[in-house]
Amino acid sequence: VRLLAVDNFATIGKLLSQEDCVSKILPIVASFSQDKSWRVRYMVALQLYEVCECVSADVVKEEMLPAYVRLLRDIEAEVRIASAGKVSKFCQLVGADASVSSILPCIKDLASDSSQHVRAALANVIMGLAPVLGKTLTIEQLLPLFLALLKDEFPDVRLNIISKLDQVNQVIGIDLLSQ
């Protein structure tokens, strides 16, 4: 039942007022992000961004950012894959400061995750962080991760990075990227 309930949180949240969503939906989602069943946590990871769209960025930072960080650090690879796939969207929602302080340490861990599928999921979306972080933070924080992922032993990881290079190019420029 919990598994099926998670699938409807975003839909219900969009029908409620923001205050009702904060008081009724977010506490349940936060609780389910710690559920003993990895499948429930997986569904929360898939739906969390859509639920967060129903409330303000400040509420997301206060209420849901800790839940998202927990999902990024989950013991199950499937949960990490699902949450890593939403990292760019979530960072756009919370902004550069919260992304650097809370999410970027998780991204650094995921870039060297033992699961190649987690690294591939991250590589598919990590380039989308460049516009959120801006030129300086992209150069300082993300460029080393891009380079590490470009050297990954798993070809899907490298392919995902290469296919998204245009997003970084728009932020830091071709000259720096080609170095």
Q: What are these language model-derived features?
A:
Residues 1-4, 16:
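A generic tandem-repeat structural signature
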Residues 39, 74-82, 86, 116:
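A generic structural signal for ordered secondary structure
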Residues 19-33, 58-72, 97-111, 136-150, ...:
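HEAT/HEAT-like alpha-solenoid repeats
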Residues 7-11, 27, 46-50, 66, ...:
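Residue-level signature of alpha-solenoid helical repeat scaffolds
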Residues 1, 36-37, 75-76, 114-115, ...:
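Short inter-helical turns and helix N-cap capping residues of alpha-solenoid HEAT/ARM repeat scaffolds
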Residues 12-19, 50-58, 90-97, 128-136, ...:
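Residue-level signature of the C-terminal ends
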